[in-house]
Amino acid sequence: MNKNTWVIGFTLFAMFFGAGNLIFPPNLGLDSGQFFWPAILAFVLTGIDLPLLGVIVGALDKEGYIGALNKISPKFSILFLIIIYLTIGPLFAIPRTASTSFEMTITPIIHSNSSIALFIFTIIYFIVVLYICLNPSKLIDRIGSLLTPLLLITILAMIIKGYLDFSGNTAGKGNEALYHSNFSSFAEGFTQGYLTMDAIAAIAFSMIVVNAVKLTGITKTNQIFKQTLTAGLIAAVALIFIYISLGYIGNHMPVSDMTLDQLKSKDRNIGTYLLTTMASTGFGSFGKYLLGIIVALACLTTACGLIGAVSEYFHRIVPKVSYKAFVLVFILMSFIIANQGLNAVISMSIPVLSIVYPVAITVVLLILIAKFIPTKRISQQIPVIIVFILSIFSVISKLGWLKINFIESLPLRAYSLEWFPVAIIATILGYLVGIFVKQDPIKYQQE
């Protein structure tokens, strides 16, 4: 394993390890109570395993996801990727990195969620992002060689001290309404993993990783696939350690019901409170500055990776507009949305993610299946269409806009996983229909 692979692996870790990866694991640990392990393992499944799979599947075709999705439908490829890139880009994920950075670096110092302070902070934050992203050829090196080592050292220090401070405590009762059995906890952890947005971000990051591997002189698809897999495993191991560690510490932190009620009444994010408490308990007044460094580095690396990926994709489909112009446009959009505040950004993203995630997971698995089992285009189109329509109606019903009895009666609906058995049935149906349709099996470009 050469130095380039390590740099790419660390870069991928840093791009994945952003705002949600910090605040969701300790929150999950607190809420899961006695059912921590099924919850955190499910969170790891959607927060790490699926993103890793998403990255390496993107290396199966010479043209990446653009080429693989074109096999399903060229129009679907463009529409789906635009939705993906906007979701994990300027509409939700990038603004969240800025608002999280503010809430965990500035708010503990000024003791308020001042909109003016947020405005000033986001201006400075996105100027730094702009500087790093303007030269895409240096993006990997700047993140992997400079920012990631600092991020790993600082967060490791906080995890070790947090474990020493809180591991002796017994786990709290947690949120018993959601976490009342092994299965309910697994299902809740699985859907909580959606909020990291990493499984759909993997589709975007795959392009950056594959391009970085190519820049090292590797051109054959099989070798690109192996290097991408190795880099992905490096990132995954680091993420698994950090997720479980932060979740475990959160699971053993004593937080009273009164404190939780106060946080909710002040619109404070509970995950950020847990991290702040962890840092201040372990390092005193210096803790908030240590946490600030961790958050700033984690969010900054993710924001840079996302801005770079989104801008490269849109420049590719609209070549008349330069990469730098797209960088400026998406940073401006992210700046505007970030100023709505952290909880607002998270709340806005949940319905969209509930539609996009099932489709993204289905697409990634269908591409992987087609690599090993002869698959016709119609066999991929049917499950994608069915899961997409089902996800839309599921969100409509969950939001209360229209009560759909059929949706509410589906298996696993109580756990927001009703799409999964439907996806399996739709995939089988697609293959049966494919038997009677005259189409050539899908072949991914290797050279």
Swiss-Prot record:
Q: Where in the cell is it found?
A: Cell membrane
Check the record and name the InterPro entries matching this protein. Brnchd-chn_aa_trnsp_Livcs
Indicate the transmembrane segments per the record. Answer: 6-26, 40-60, 74-94, 114-134, 143-163, 193-213, 229-249, 290-310, 326-346, 350-370, 382-402, 417-437
Disulfide bridge map: none
Keyword Zinc (UniProt): no
UniProt keywords (A-Z) are:
Amino-acid transport, Cell membrane, Membrane, Transmembrane, Transmembrane helix, Transport
Q: Name one GO cellular component term.
A: plasma membrane
In this record, what's one Pfam family?
Branch_AA_trans
**Keyword flag Transmembrane helix:** yes
A GO BP annotation: L-leucine transport
Q: Write out the GO MF terms.
A: L-isoleucine transmembrane transporter activity; L-leucine transmembrane transporter activity; L-valine transmembrane transporter activity
Q: Domain of life of the organism in this record?
A: Bacteria
Q: What does this gene product do?
A: Component of the transport system for branched-chain amino acids (leucine, isoleucine and valine), which is coupled to a proton motive force (Potential). Contributes to NaCl tolerance.
Give the family per the record. Answer: Belongs to the branched chain amino acid transporter family.
| Designated name of the protein | Putative branched-chain amino acid carrier protein SAB1263c
